[in-house]
Curated annotation (Swiss-Prot):
Cellular component GO terms, alphabetical: cytoplasm; plasma membrane
Keywords assigned by UniProt, alphabetized: Cell inner membrane, Cell membrane, Cytoplasm, Membrane
Protein family per UniProt: Belongs to the HflD family.
Gene that encodes the chain: hflD
Keyword Thylakoid attached: no
Protein location: Cytoplasm; Cell inner membrane
Domain of life: Bacteria
InterPro entries noted in UniProt: HflD (IPR007451), HflD-like_sf (IPR035932)
The name this protein goes by in its record: High frequency lysogenization protein HflD homolog
Membrane topology label: Peripheral membrane protein
Pfam family, one: DUF489
UniProt key word Repeat: no
Amino acid sequence: MSYNLENQVIALAGVFQSAALVDQLAKQGTVAPTSYECSLKSLLKVDATSTLDVYGDIYGLQLGLKELIAVLERKQDRKKVDVVRYALTLLYLEGKVNKRGDMLDVMSQRIAQINTQTLHFEPTHTNIISAFASLYSDTISTFPQRIQVTGDPRFLRVDENADKIRALLLAGIRAAVLWRQVGGRRWKLFFMRKKILQIANGMLR
């Protein structure tokens, strides 16, 4: 995959989309279905030929692009401060994962196993979501710094929602890994903000 800013914006939108979906689920008990499916399916795209191929098409990433643009334009709704916190923590945790070859191997093996399950179940089926959630718990959740999800206890107490949140956080890690693979670095968010904004706005439909 090419080291260019367009690919980095796509991957970064994937990070922010996962963060936004976690926030929706935690506070509203529901998620935007198209965005949700797009993010989950990205976990299964292990042989993608391009960054966009990971997500299928740019339409599935519209939520992530909107969130990214709002942050870079500094027009983020105060009610969505948690989205930024989740996204930045995902980028931080990816850095930790990147140093753990053993963990990356485990994740790769487990994703391959989950991929075989999709021969019988849709990516959004509870069995697949549960498998993603278990993978997140066995790997990313073992780091001292965890993502503390805040929201309505009525929704957070539901086991199915908890699994969905973990699956979405795993998708966020996947996007952060992709972002690094195509040359993404945190300093670019500050020093290349205007260019990233221009590209993200061009992708927005």
